[in-house]
């Protein structure tokens, strides 16, 4: 019982700082507060009543259905533990449209997460059906990979290492704007959308969708 209370106290005071320093709050909790990562997952992510929060999105499902699978493969890459990711995909009725999931291994003290290059290297290797090794990680070519993510830090990280397209899904933006190119504070280029359907209009992405006019 004390550990659960401790998690709550730490989350209230330290979560933001851990996220900023480590890219993911749980890494700071593991390294500095001896939190059991699987206990954290059980009492935090798995305890969230997602069935009451999430529901299938027909527009999102149609967007994924409209991707030409002879031109593009769809993977989910997440900083969550795999059980949480699979649970979300099932609730959203998207499991059958996702070819694979790359997640964080909470059982590994030194696990990588977005936006670290090592995480993206492993994601590329796994999407190509390769077991990550020193050789194929170093040879990872990001130019044929496209990423859309709702966390700007992840998009900037992907753009810096050469992803073919890095798109920030700014769902909370007050501006009603279409897809557009922009730059981060340090000058890193990326694209921003305020609705996922706007991916259809981006130069690189639109070639991945089925042409319904023919």
Name these PLM-found stretches.
Residues 1-58, 62, 69, 83:
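N-terminal helical cap/lid subdomain that shapes the substrate entry/recognition surface
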Residues 51-55, 76, 111-115:
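Short, surface-exposed alpha-helical recognition segments that flank or form part
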Residues 65-68, 82-214:
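Asp-based, Mg2+/Mn2+-dependent phosphohydrolase catalytic module
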Residues 78-80:
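Conserved phosphate-coupling serine/threonine residues in phosphotransfer and NTP-handling enzymes
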């Amino acid at each position: 019982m004390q550990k659960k209370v401790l998690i709550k106290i730490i989350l209230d005071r330290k979560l933001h700082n851990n996220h900023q320093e480590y890219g993911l709050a749980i890494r700071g909790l593991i390294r500095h507060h001896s939190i059991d990562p699987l206990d954290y997952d059980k009492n935090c992510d798995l305890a969230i009543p997602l069935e009451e929060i999430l529901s299938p999105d027909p527009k999102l499902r149609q967007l994924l259905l409209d991707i030409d699978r002879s031109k593009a493969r769809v993977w989910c890459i997440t900083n969550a533990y795999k059980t949480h990711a699979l649970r979300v995909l099932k609730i959203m009725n998207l499991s059958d449209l996702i070819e694979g999931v790359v997640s964080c291994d909470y059982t590994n003290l030194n696990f990588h997460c977005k936006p670290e290059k090592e995480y993206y290297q492993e994601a590329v290797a796994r999407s190509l059906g390769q077991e990550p090794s020193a050789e194929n990680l170093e040879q990872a070519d990001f130019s044929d990979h496209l990423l859309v993510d709702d966390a700007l830090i992840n998009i900037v990280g992907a753009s810096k290492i050469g992803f073919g397209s890095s798109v920030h899904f700014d769902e909370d933006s007050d501006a009603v704007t279409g897809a557009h190119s922009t730059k981060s504070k340090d000058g890193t280029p990326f694209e921003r959308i305020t609705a996922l359907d706007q991916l259809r209009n981006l130069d690189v992405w639109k070639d991945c969708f089925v042409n319904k006019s023919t």
